[in-house]
Amino acid sequence: MKKQMHPDYHPVVFQDASTGKSFLTRSTVTSERTVEWEDGGTYPLLVVDVTSDSHPFWTGAQRVMDTAGRVEKFERRYGKRKAL
């Protein structure tokens, strides 16, 4: 097998931005931010918007997403069109 064909696969901590829950897993993604884990090791930290700890499919809870602001911003920028 050729060397340098596959990216570096290493331990990484993903943290849910809304719940604060952290998950130690392996990934090819890198980050400048680091965090000290429970085992005493220091790992790259990536903060993500949604994980299994906050996604409605996994939690069974429905949460209202704030999309009204996005729609209004789109309509202001591009104008509201008339229905056909």
From Swiss-Prot:
GO molecular function, one term: structural constituent of ribosome
InterPro entries: Ribosomal_bL28/bL31-like_sf (IPR034704), Ribosomal_bL31 (IPR002150), Ribosomal_bL31_B (IPR027493), Ribosomal_bL31_sf (IPR042105)
GO cellular component: a single term: ribosome
Organism: Rhodococcus erythropolis (strain PR4 / NBRC 100887)
Keyword Zinc (UniProt): no
Domain of life: Bacteria
Gene Ontology process terms (BP): translation
Subunit details: Part of the 50S ribosomal subunit.
Entry protein name: Large ribosomal subunit protein bL31B
Pfam families (alphabetical): Ribosomal_L31
Keywords, sorted A to Z: Ribonucleoprotein, Ribosomal protein
Entry similarity comment: Belongs to the bacterial ribosomal protein bL31 family. Type B subfamily.
